[in-house]
């Protein structure tokens, strides 16, 4: 049986892969598992459990929100609905309000027809795999009880939780952003209103791009996965920095004043060095995934900073950070976790840390990113093959071993199946772009021929 939860919650085409019925069932099962049998008592032992619910701007978010709220309230949970909000705002609201758990409706960077459900446990942390599995099993069973009368949940709108999140973000800034001109691309998503508001409150001169909150156009040629319009806008407006969020604003990429892209690895390198300089980088350690550029590893080694590597997914980065007590980690894609200020990847917080560093040093972003040199990296996505055999197919394993031997210490090869899409990713790094591209294309061809078609 295919697991319902992927690496970042439940995701698929809304109304086909993810229906209102499934959303209601999942919400009800989550209350059963996370609140337990005594659902008239919340975490403090007083009153019903409270669940925070937020969504991005996708049209399908409206009916999915209605279904989730119905499932929660019918199962005896009170609902604090915060409306359109970044994913990390839901996590913060759960932690700050003492809610039992939180639900975010978003498919992040995926196209508009998709949607998804992410759950946050008490304290604002993403759920462990075993808890997600328990919820999935519970979905197959009838409800253990149906509250009636005063025991059913009540629903209220709580926009004040977003205001508190914004205030929390602003409190993390080391210095005001006065004098900085910033272009922020909100991808027509969850940060469309909040990101420009927070940056202006911090003192920046803000140009807002793709910030109408038009969910029909979410991630369409905009945001963290489509940086061309941001690059052009930064140059056209003479901005100091460009900031790009994805649909749910849990990640952030940047653009320097010349229009050059600054990826998650460069952001992490810059922030790691800043924290180490202040003596705030716990154990001089940063946590990244296997996708981080080899150039990042080289830069950290030269700075005396230890790098701990995890599987792909900010949830695994976070688990490793919590286990080791580390304060900084993230992904090349722009999910960055500052564990001393957040419980999950936070695009708005990351933007403020980038801009704060520019403001306090007086150095251009392009100068700060020279902390590391990226090795050429080529990523090829192979669709239509059985991704479950990536780690077991002998022909493919031999091809990977040969490629690694060819590149030696000056390059890297990584093959993995996507946790959110039906594809296999082939990633190669090498001393030159041509070498990386040649090896990647060769391995992609082996993937297509060695692996059977997807079922």
Curated annotation (Swiss-Prot):
Residues with the Phosphoserine modification: 108
Binding note for cofactor: Binds 1 Mg(2+) ion per subunit.
Keyword terms: Isomerase, Magnesium, Metal-binding, Phosphoprotein
Family: Belongs to the phosphohexose mutase family.
Keyword tRNA processing: no
EC number: 5.4.2.10
Domain of life, source organism: Bacteria
GO MF annotation list: magnesium ion binding; phosphoglucosamine mutase activity; phosphomannomutase activity
Identification of the protein by name: Phosphoglucosamine mutase
Alphabetized Gene3D superfamilies for the sequence: Alpha-D-Glucose-1,6-Bisphosphate, subunit A, domain 3 (3.40.120.10), Alpha-D-phosphohexomutase, C-terminal domain (3.30.310.50)
Entry annotation: catalytic residues: 108 (phosphoserine intermediate)
GO cellular component terms, A-Z: cytosol
Binding site residues for Mg(2+): 108, 246, 248, 250
Organism this protein belongs to: Frankia casuarinae (strain DSM 45818 / CECT 9043 / HFP020203 / CcI3)
Cofactor requirements of the protein: Mg(2+)
Modified how: Activated by phosphorylation.
Alphabetized PROSITE patterns for the sequence: PGM_PMM (PS00710)
Reactions listed under catalytic activity: alpha-D-glucosamine 1-phosphate = D-glucosamine 6-phosphate
GO BP, sorted A to Z: carbohydrate metabolic process; peptidoglycan biosynthetic process; UDP-N-acetylglucosamine biosynthetic process
Listed Pfam families: PGM_PMM_I, PGM_PMM_II, PGM_PMM_III, PGM_PMM_IV
InterPro entries, per the entry: A-D-PHexomutase_a/b/a-I, A-D-PHexomutase_a/b/a-I/II/III, A-D-PHexomutase_a/b/a-II, A-D-PHexomutase_a/b/a-III, A-D-PHexomutase_C, A-D-PHexomutase_C_sf, A-D-PHexomutase_CS, Alpha-D-phosphohexomutase_SF
Annotated NCBIfam families: glmM
Primary role: Catalyzes the conversion of glucosamine-6-phosphate to glucosamine-1-phosphate.
């Amino acid at each position: 049986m295919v697991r319902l939860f992927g690496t970042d919650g439940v995701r698929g085409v809304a109304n086909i892969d993810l229906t209102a019925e499934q959303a209601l069932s999942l919400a009800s099962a989550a209350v059963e598992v996370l609140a337990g049998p005594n659902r008239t008592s919340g975490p403090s032992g007083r009153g019903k459990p409270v669940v925070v619910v937020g969504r991005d701007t996708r049209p399908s978010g409206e009916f999915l929100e209605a279904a989730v709220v119905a499932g929660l309230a019918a199962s005896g949970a009170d609902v604090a609905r915060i409306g359109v909000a970044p994913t990390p705002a839901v996590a913060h609201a759960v932690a700050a309000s003492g809610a039992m758990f939180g639900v975010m409706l978003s498919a992040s960077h995926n196209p508009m027809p998709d949607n998804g459900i992410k759950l946050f446990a008490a304290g604002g942390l993403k759920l462990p795999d075993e808890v997600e599995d328990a919820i999935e099993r519970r979905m197959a069973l009838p409800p253990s009880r149906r509250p009636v009368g005063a025991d059913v949940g009540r629903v209220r709108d709580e926009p004040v939780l977003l205001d508190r999140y914004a205030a929390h973000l602003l409190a993390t800034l080391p210095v005001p952003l006065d004098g900085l001109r910033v272009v922020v691309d909100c991808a027509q998503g969850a940060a469309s209103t909040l990101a420009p508001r927070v940056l202006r409150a911090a003192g920046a001169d803000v140009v807002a791009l793709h910030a109408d909150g038009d969910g029909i156009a979410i991630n369409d040629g905009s945001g963290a996965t489509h940086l061309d319009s941001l690059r052009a806008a930064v140059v056209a407006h003479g901005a100091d920095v460009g900031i790009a969020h994805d649909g749910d604003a849990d990640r952030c990429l940047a653009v320097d004043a010349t229009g050059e892209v600054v990826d998650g690895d460069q952001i992490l390198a810059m922030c790691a060095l800043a924290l180490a300089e202040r003596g705030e980088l716990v154990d001089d350690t940063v946590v990244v995934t296997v996708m981080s550029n080899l150039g990042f590893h080289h830069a950290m080694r030269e700075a005396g900073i230890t790098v701990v590597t995890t599987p792909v997914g900010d949830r695994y980065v976070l688990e490793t950070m919590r286990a080791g007590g580390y304060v900084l980690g993230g992904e090349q894609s722009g999910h960055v976790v500052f564990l001393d200020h957040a419980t999950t990847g936070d695009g708005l917080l990351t933007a403020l840390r980038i801009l704060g560093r520019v403001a306090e040093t007086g150095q251009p972003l392009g100068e700060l990113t020279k902390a590391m040199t990226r090795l050429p990296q080529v990523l090829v996505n192979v669709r239509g093959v059985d991704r479950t055999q990536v780690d077991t197919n002998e022909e493919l394993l031999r091809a990977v071993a040969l490629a690694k031997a060819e590149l030696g210490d000056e390059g890297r090869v990584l093959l993995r199946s996507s946790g959110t899409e039906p594809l296999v990713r082939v990633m190669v790094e090498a001393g030159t772009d041509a070498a990386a591209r040649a090896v990647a294309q060769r391995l992609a061809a082996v993937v297509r021929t060695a692996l059977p078609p997807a079922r």
